[in-house]
Amino acid sequence: MKIIKTLTDMIEDELEGAEHYAECALMYKEDHPQLANTLYEISTQEMRHVNLLHEEVVAVIKKHREAHGEPPAAMQEIYEWVHIRQIEMAKEIKILQSQFREG
């Protein structure tokens, strides 16, 4: 379904942004603490966007199941692969964010 592809692309964009901002926050933490805090906050906001978009994907899949039954197996496999990859990205970002908070 095209809408799921669009939403998963948006999720990946948000994840990439969150990672970029978290890395920059770590890079500037010592010399520019105010900037680093701002970048960290932007990173956490991007992760909130990821969660909101994921909730929308879940809702679309649920609506499809109610109206048409299970999605085709190939589509489900692709979505699961993308979802697992996104979960791994989110874990790495949370590690970066944790390093910022603890460091």
Each model region followed by its residue ranges:
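Non-heme di-metal
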Residues: 1-103
